[in-house]
């Protein structure tokens, strides 16, 4: 899935769109996506000016965006202006490696369970072979007025 397809699926735009490409997707099972991290990211201006590091919360957000793409594919729906995909919870978040300009984040997200409109995912983000972040994510899709 290229960036044009991602833009049709996710409502996020610059500077918060954190998925550049989907490398693999298995409906109802898993997704593998990537984010190219460059020095041009706006968060590096303040985090930290003399030693730029990607904020951990944005690694979690990148995994959540990949999870949303998997959820939409699994349900066979295309989101619209009346559908919002929310975080419902994060458990066991661990940050194991700093992510710096020039790194490529690979997000591997697995759908663990789907029940009553709540999705539970297991996500691992890597740079090369090294784990940068891992967490369990809970998300829900809601219709808004």
UniProtKB/Swiss-Prot annotation:
Known role: Involved in unsaturated fatty acids biosynthesis. Catalyzes the dehydration of short chain beta-hydroxyacyl-ACPs and long chain saturated and unsaturated beta-hydroxyacyl-ACPs.
NCBIfam families: fabZ, PRK00006.1
Pfam families: FabA
Family, per entry: Belongs to the thioester dehydratase family. FabZ subfamily.
Assigned keywords, A-Z: Cytoplasm, Lipid A biosynthesis, Lipid biosynthesis, Lipid metabolism, Lyase
Example of a GO MF term: (3R)-hydroxyacyl-[acyl-carrier-protein] dehydratase activity
InterPro entries assigned to the protein according to its UniProt record, in alphabetical order: FabA_FabZ, FabZ, HotDog_dom_sf
Localisation per UniProt entry: Cytoplasm
Top EC class of this enzyme: lyase
EC id: 4.2.1.59
Top-rank taxon: Bacteria
GO biological process: fatty acid biosynthetic process; lipid A biosynthetic process
Active-site positions on this chain: 47
Reactions accelerated catalytically: a (3R)-hydroxyacyl-[ACP] = a (2E)-enoyl-[ACP] + H2O
A single cellular component GO annotation: cytoplasm
Protein name, as recorded: 3-hydroxyacyl-[acyl-carrier-protein] dehydratase FabZ
């Amino acid at each position: 899935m290229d960036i044009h397809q991602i833009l049709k699926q996710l409502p996020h735009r610059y500077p918060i769109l954190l998925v550049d490409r989907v490398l693999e997707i298995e409906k109802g099972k898993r997704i593998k996506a990537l984010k190219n991290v460059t020095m041009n990211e706006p968060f590096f201006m303040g985090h930290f000016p003399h030693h730029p590091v990607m904020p951990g919360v944005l690694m979690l957000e990148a995994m959540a965006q990949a999870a949303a793409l998997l959820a939409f594919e699994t349900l066979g729906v295309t989101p619209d202006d009346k559908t919002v995909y929310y975080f419902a919870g994060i458990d066991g978040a661990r940050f194991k490696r700093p992510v710096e300009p020039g790194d490529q984040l690979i997000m591997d997200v697995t759908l663990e369970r789907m029940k009553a409109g709540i999705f539970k995912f297991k996500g691992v983000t890597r740079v090369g072979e090294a784990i940068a972040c891992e967490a369990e994510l809970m998300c829900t899709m809601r219709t808004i007025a």
